[in-house]
C-alpha cells in the first residue's frame, strides 16, 4: 500500500510539473473569444457592444501581439467578429452550448482569474484530473501491477496530444476528463 501511495505522489508531482510547463506554453487561438464572450454574455445579457468590447480587450491585454493579431485577422470571418459586435454575438450560441465548460470558466473567473486565464486554468485543471483518472482506471484494470500502471499513466500524460489539448482554448480536454470520470465511476460501480 505504501509503495502505491509513493508512486501516486511521484506521479502527481510529475503531473504538476507538466501542468506548470503547459501554463508557460499556453496558446491563444480563435476559439478563445467565443468562450470569453460566452461568460460575459451571461454577465451582461443583451449588451452585445459591452460583451464584444470586454472580450477583445481582455484577450488583447494577455495575448502576445502576434497571437492576438492571428485571432482577429486570420480570415474574413474573424476580422468581422472583431470589428462588428453583432457578428460576434451571432457566433456565441455555438460556444454557449458547451454549458459545463462555460460554467467551469465562469467558476475560475469568479475565483479571480482573468477570463483568458480562466479558460486556460479550466483546461489545465481538466488535464491534471484526466491524468489522475487515467491512473485510477489503469489501477483498476491492473490492480497488482503498480509499476505498469505508473508507466502507462506517465506515458499517456506526457504524450504531446495531452499537452496540446491542455493549452488549447477549447473544451476537448474538459470533455475527455468528464468522460474518464464517468468511466471510472462505472468501473467502481460494476467491478
PLM features per residue range, with description:
Residues 1-19, 23, 27:
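Start-transfer (signal-anchor) and selected internal transmembrane alpha helices
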Residues 25-39:
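Alpha-helical transmembrane signal-anchor/signal-peptide segments
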Residues 44-97:
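Interfacial juxtamembrane loops and adjacent helix segments
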Residues 82-92, 96, 100-122:
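Juxtamembrane segments of multi-pass membrane glycosylation machinery
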Residues 105, 109, 135-143, 187:
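Membrane-water interface at transmembrane helix exits
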Residues 112-117, 141-150, 189-191:
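Membrane-helix interface segments
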Residues 121-142:
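Transmembrane-helix motifs of polytopic, lipid-linked glycan transferases
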Residues 125-126, 140, 146, 150-154, ...:
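Multi-pass, polyprenyl lipid-linked donor-dependent membrane glycosyltransferases
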Amino acid at each position: 500500500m505504501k509503495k502505491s501511495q509513493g508512486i501516486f505522489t511521484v506521479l502527481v508531482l510529475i503531473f504538476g510539473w507538466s501542468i506548470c510547463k503547459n501554463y508557460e506554453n499556453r496558446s491563444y487561438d480563435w476559439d478563445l473569444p467565443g468562450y470569453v464572450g460566452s461568460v460575459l454574455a451571461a454577465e451582461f445579457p443583451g449588451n452585445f457592444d459591452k460583451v464584444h468590447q470586454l472580450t477583445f480587450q481582455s484577450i488583447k491585454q494577455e495575448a502576445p501581439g502576434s497571437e492576438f493579431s492571428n485571432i482577429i485577422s486570420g480570415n474574413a470571418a474573424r476580422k468581422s467578429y472583431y470589428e462588428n459586435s453583432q457578428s460576434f454575438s451571432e457566433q456565441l450560441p455555438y460556444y454557449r452550448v458547451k454549458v459545463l465548460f462555460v460554467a467551469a470558466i465562469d467558476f475560475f473567473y469568479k475565483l479571480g482569474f482573468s477570463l483568458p486565464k480562466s479558460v486556460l486554468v479550466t483546461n489545465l485543471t481538466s488535464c491534471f484530473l484526466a491524468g489522475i483518472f487515467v491512473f485510477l482506471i489503469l489501477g483498476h484494470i491492473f490492480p497488482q501491477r503498480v509499476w505498469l500502471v505508473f508507466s502507462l499513466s506517465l506515458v499517456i500524460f506526457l504524450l504531446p496530444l495531452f499537452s496540446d489539448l491542455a493549452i488549447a482554448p477549447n473544451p476537448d480536454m474538459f470533455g475527455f476528463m468528464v468522460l474518464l470520470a464517468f468511466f471510472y465511476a462505472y468501473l467502481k460501480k460494476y467491478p
